[in-house]
């Protein structure tokens, strides 16, 4: 008897609009192949703040801050079939979205 599998997909992007579009594409593709989908679940946004001094020599009180936000989503596909895996491999995602896929036995 084989154990059931679960596919966990993590998406990361600096642009939340691209991230939402990609998550929607993945969910639609998985549902069209007959798999159960849980998500997309929004994960906490990472915020990195970088502070630099504006002047090249002195004036340490004059500073400027920049921030980079990394938005994340989690999608679980329960009991994926071979058809689901093949369809997900063919999905084209934008260049600004990082995807991490893990298969896990439940």
From Swiss-Prot:
Alphabetical UniProt keywords: Ribonucleoprotein, Ribosomal protein
GO cellular component term of the entry, any: ribosome
One MF term in the entry's GO annotations: structural constituent of ribosome
Any Pfam family the entry gives: Ribosomal_S10
Xref: Gene3D superfamilies: Ribosomal protein S10 domain
GO terms under biological process: translation
Function, as annotated: Involved in the binding of tRNA to the ribosomes.
Cross-referenced HAMAP family: Ribosomal_uS10
Similarity remark: Belongs to the universal ribosomal protein uS10 family.
Subunit structure: Part of the 30S ribosomal subunit.
Protein name, UniProt field: Small ribosomal subunit protein uS10
